């Protein structure tokens, strides 16, 4: 018999944490809009590097590299698919949610939230900012990678956070846009893991196989 309480408790915890973080980010939006702006962020090597974490082909290349290295392992193909699918689903989710929330990107001169009417370009996400697509892709990919390589989770999330920060610095998004995207990205990766990975998470097959290998092999 399924224990629905144990199944729903983690998602309730996620909802509460996400709600608090998103509310706090909205309170901090005016400060972030004024203080974090750096229009030349993408003229810098580190800025372009961090932005690439929100670019889907980056994760496709990483998933392909993982598959080429681990395709002979029992779950190598499944994990590679997970690494590709998590950011892909994250990006698709961002585009769909933009059509729902319809909040415009920040203005260059004045702070304030503006919404696009549903009758105005109903199927176009151009100019819409909530949630940030780059950030959602980056965090969905980082959360997926952190499940595969848990010891590197800190690095994964730091790079994704860097991607999010550059979007605020470039004035492409409000702070709340990227915080909401980060929360949703983590949820996308967690939901997919529960369906694609053994026990909802996995260690690297390389580590698993090496732990079984003989010292003389």
Model feature map: region roles:
Residues 1-63, 98-122:
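N-terminal transmembrane-helix/juxtamembrane module of multi-pass inner/ER membrane proteins
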Residues 2-6, 11-13, 113-212, 216-217:
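Membrane-embedded catalytic cores of phosphoryl/pyrophosphoryl-handling enzymes
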Residues 10-15, 75-83, 178:
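Residue-level signature of transmembrane alpha-helical entry/exit and packing/kink sites
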Residues 20-27, 88-95, 160-171:
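Aromatic-anchored segments of alpha-helical transmembrane domains
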Residues 21, 82-90, 94, 181, ...:
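Alpha-helical transmembrane segments in multi-pass membrane proteins
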Residues 43, 74-78, 107, 149-155:
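Membrane-helix interface segments
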Residues 54-67, 134-138, 145:
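Hydrophobic alpha-helical transmembrane segments
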Residues 65-97:
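Interfacial segments of alpha-helical transmembrane regions
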